[in-house]
């Protein structure tokens, strides 16, 4: 026999049996047979999914020699030093274990090792060495040194010591030792290369191992020899499986010696093998190891492999073949064995194969780490592994056939087979027995997983101990023996689900034959007892519950492995489940006694969890006839979906089967006129014959029924009089062709009236249908019941369920014709000519849209939509799809026709009669003023024919009343703790300036609502809560934790004693969980419904609760899920545990009890936690209730429902002050009684009073109002507002959104201290060390707070950033006396603020500002910047705004500024609070505000020096002319300075900083905001001064004048709080560059050096400016020179006037050089007025402040700024004089604007201590510029010499010029690259080291009040 293809294992001389035992200690862990059933547990996740098939060599098998699994492992472990020496070894047993056994086959061992052993192992080694040599010839691996050299890496110079060779005995240990050494030398080595080097190193290490001949080797040799000797006992037999049994002489069944802990050490030879027939021993091939190629592509399996697969597939089909998957339906075909091919190879061929080395289709990388190297190959799939990557890792390669962990898990085992495509065929050795057969049987007993003598099955690989069989066998049987698995009967079908299991009866015992030599007197041996086995009760796929039956465990295990495993996992398999399925034992016992049939069914089915309904026919859907003429019926079972319908034969015994067959044929006959029916004649059954409806109408529908017709009497029901009236009205409307809305109040039986209406149409011959009813899924069961009761002759189909159910309904219930609808799960159109089988189709809203294909293809006689407010939005898909259906008549049912507004009502009417109601605008316009009587009458007339609405109060005069009481409850101490904690934790979100948004506030409200309900709703509290052993909360602690539960406990006790029953509603399902625990603790029985409980279960719970004598005392419902179509009239007390946001949901909820059938007074208790968000929500809900019904609001229907941020903030504040006050007064303790009279205590008396049912309702007014709003008409009731109408304006205004006055600092004051305390505690607890507290100027804060509180009328939390300068300005001077109100304006206090959003005459108003006024306001902002604090008295108030009160104006300014600060896309249509944006561009507005604030600040700085008149001599003239005082501003030409602005002399240090901020923001277009004022305030002055001294580049011309003011200016107080302005972006070009480069300019020296180049970008931008400036200069000079003579006198006067003005732009603009030149010219020529210079610039800015941005004409016309006209006087006669003048002013202003921005940047740079970054590209530009300058200056003389004709100088000059040119072109290139570097400027937030939120909140803060002396000056 040829050996394997690898190198041999070294072996030593003798080896004893003890050696084999010793090997047990070294072996791989055994494959855990005890885990056979679930091998997943043995393997890591990663190994499971990768399965790939590989080819294996074949080896003959012998079943007769016993084998030991563990010994096989030992042998494997001892073979060879390293993985590369191990060759593929044979696997000897086939595994066909459906349980997924981990059994791995191994080699056999003979009891005695013969003397030939050593010789054998030597010859084996020799042969293997030869083969290895051949292998090496073909592919010699490189040494590690060669590999490293090839890759250019360093080798390690470690010399292995003797100790190393002793300790590093396996690859893993070696790898762990050597790998770090290699990595240290070559840190960047790739993993794949590392693996190759390690492999090579290990190979060398193993080869050089001096100990390899000793113990380890001898062990291996012993193992090899042992195996060889074992092989000598193997006899070859025929490969093919045994043919079908024939008559043969009796022989013993097959046995074998299995492996395992109990296997015998020295087993005897098998009795079936004659000693004479021992074949020659075979050699053991070691396991295959492959050295994977690195980086090679993963191979796909070869084509031969595919061929084999095909072949094996054919073979597998044969009856006699067996495979791994025998008995396992879930096995994949890939795992089947590839059967051997019959061909044998010749020896020569085999040798050739050996020379070639083996080629496999294995992957050449490790499955786990995906790297190559030395890998061992799996024999049952193409995977390969490193030994160290296995889990657990192998120390030595296993010998023989080895399956990888994946195959072990999948249950795939190696099977011997021929594989001639791979050239690995192994021939039998000469002299071998051709009959020899491989033993494919399991090595372990299938039952106990142990070894020993095993009985082998003749047709499958299973083996058993005879004592493990059930019943046990006394001895090995004779002849062929089939195991239990092979004799296991097949299942009768596919199992759908396992219902239950039980222990079966043990099989009858096996008699033990008396031994022949036994004493005849001894008693016969005791028969062997069998064991009871599990029996499983299963439901079969496609069969009804009638066919459920018991199957054995083995059957399930074989045929439904996955299902069986899953069932085992989920259920206790030791103790069978009890048979009690919630039925009432007492009742069922009584019934069993009376009804033997029931007793039988109980015994067979019901006790095992099958409900009686599932075995009752609901209806027969269809029939079919088979070839033999037998009829089968498709039956739909009660309470089961359609996909559980099953075909049953006509002669099956089923209760009422004949009745249903009869009704099926009756209906068929009725609809199709068919008489004949196939099959047996039906038995006569008493069944009311269906009457065919008349062909033509028999009754005039317009005639009223005085009493109900006979066909209704036949149903046994009686309609109420008002229902008869409803029926008459519906029939009348049908006759008139009027589509209708039945809007009766909830609980008046709209469903019944509708069913009766449809039934009357059918019975009277008006229509046979089909009728379509669309209802909420939860109410469909109720609809079914009502139709069953009131319309028994109608065929009603419920079209709901999953795809499968609906497909069955479509195929069988839509039409009698087979091909009317295309089959399949996708709905398709129904054929036009096909007749419809049903009369009524009930379906849900969703399916109307999902299955519109089929439903839309049917012509419906009538559509009914239940809960029709689903149609209130004409944009919904439901509305649009339903509109496309073919509908002859429409009826809408709704209990709340006017749930929100008139628009929704219009949509309902539009759906009903689109031809009449199609113009929404017209409709809304017509009824815009619904408050007027005639309008209401008109609307009622219009609605009259379409709507009918009755109230319970109208129709049930004797119906018990209902009383709703609001029960105020206290917070428990624990709730108070959490309430405070939630508020404190969310301080940032609550604080108006902290940037909280609507969502975060809503989250806070929800948390507080949870806290009011129960603190255990928070995970933290739930974790800490004391629990009982069973996991439920401890009852007393649960109750103590919540004020509501404390009260509920007392109430329920009294209610229970009084015999009342209670419904408890909560919005939160988790609260319902807690209530369940509470009720369990109190011992009350209850039912529960929430959103997770669907139709059937829901109805069952309701039925149980409503059943007479039901024990359930409480019913827990979730407000929304329990709100629709549920009748719980047996309860008379409703407790609303927490109120819903939407009051309609609460009304829906308590209407569950207050409805038809109620005979007791209903008490409704609404729990409301006092002084909490709940109390406020209840108030808001009441207000909403009144609004929704009293105020008809056209408008954004669906959007109006959500809470505004304002409402949320208001809700959150409610009660908080008191809560935190408690803390202060009680010292943190609980409220003491008597301390606070407002605390509510419920003692017994109070509870009695509360539960007294005679008390009158105290707080139900809003509900009465709601119900009475329809009292005037039975049709379309509408309500008039009861408030008396104010002035006309108020009447017309429709409030869309109200804005309330809010104290923005409420949270700041309330929570700041708590919050900071909490933060400190957190920091301390988290161990972050002591926190350095941020310095907070509390003084400033308190001043700001006071301002905000006193004056800010409308600052609300609708904005993340909620501050505006306008307000600040007003507020700073709030103490100063205001101007009295003008005519036409009421006093602020008299008139409340207008609502935030309102609609007046179709136009939207914002805080009372209409579109024109809003536009005017925006224009004023763009003209003047921020409104000053006295805007009310200045030019600021344009004509359009004069009608506004000061309060309104301030409120609007505040709102406008908050909108500017609100982040968001400019494209949005509205701001966060719903105010329309109207195309407002924040960027432009902020830019303008910023520029104007800079100008205003600059003018104020020098105003006290320069006065108010540019040419003071004109002042007197003007005074005389106009008789007006310059001090008091006229509306047109007001004072330049706004009184609020700081006087320039005041050395208040804050201003620059503040304005710095302004621009900061401007400068960065990120609208993020600027640095915090407070910090800036403190340090800015110094910074500014520092920056201010150097910048003026012309100290000569502007000596003290320039710098002194500059110094002065630094501390000047900024104008009114223009922090917002900061956001404005001033000049796009200069802005950002300045910002960046400003960093570089902080150092004073730099600035002095003329750091113009520092800010290269600006310089670049300024090139344009320079050109402009030069032009301006020309114009100026020309202009200046012409009028010389005219202005001499003026100049003399002027020279005496004191003047100061400077802009410290650091030389970054041309301004100072211009000023220098201009002033020089002006001084020389004495034309101070005529030549434009610094003075003119100041007055230009002053004019802009007074007249507005770019109002050049107004400025020129103002005599105060006459100086600006002087330079242009000479040009007056030119045609384009005005154009020249305006262009010049505009360009000059641009330059000033730029300079102002730079000045601000420099101040900030200084303040922020920015330093130059030498690596910045602009610095390179700076050095280049210095080079240019230096080069130019040092060679100035050359030009003169060159001009003088000096030729050498000329040549040098050319070179210098060339150098200059190069330098300049380099600079130009650098400049073009600069913008890219600018783009990387960090955002404002980063540069300010502040978070965006802090910046925004800073912006929202108002500026501090000026110091007292300043205020005095202002006044």
UniProtKB/Swiss-Prot annotation:
Motif residue range(s): KIKL: 288-291
> From which residue to which do the PHD-type zinc fingers run?
363-410, 442-489
Positions contributing to ATP binding = 744-751
The sequence motif named DEAH box is recorded at 866-869
Q: Where is the composition biased (Basic and acidic residues)?
A: 1555-1577, 1606-1652, 1660-1675, 1682-1692
Domain named Helicase C-terminal is located at 1047-1196
What Pfam families is this protein classified in? CHDCT2, CHDII_SANT-like, CHDNT, Chromo, DUF1087, Helicase_C, PHD, SNF2-rel_dom
Find the cross-link Glycyl lysine isopeptide (Lys-Gly) (interchain with G-Cter in SUMO1). 704
| UniProt KW Zinc keyword | yes
> Could you tell me which residues belong to the region Disordered?
1-150, 236-353, 503-530, 571-596, 1337-1394, 1518-1694
Q: GO molecular-function annotation terms?
A: ATP binding; ATP hydrolysis activity; ATP-dependent chromatin remodeler activity; DNA binding; DNA-binding transcription factor binding; helicase activity; zinc ion binding
Q: Where is the composition biased (Basic residues)?
A: 106-124, 333-346
Gene Ontology CC, one term:
NuRD complex
Q: Which GO terms describe its biological process?
A: chromatin remodeling; negative regulation of DNA-templated transcription; positive regulation of DNA-templated transcription; regulation of cell fate specification; regulation of stem cell differentiation
- Function summary: ATP-dependent chromatin-remodeling factor that binds and distorts nucleosomal DNA. Acts as a component of the histone deacetylase NuRD complex which participates in the remodeling of chromatin. Localizes to acetylated damaged chromatin in a ZMYND8-dependent manner, to promote transcriptional repression and double-strand break repair by homologous recombination. Involved in neurogenesis.
What is the official name of this protein in its record?
A: Chromodomain-helicase-DNA-binding protein 4
State the organism named in the record: Mus musculus
The gene that this protein is the product of is Chd4
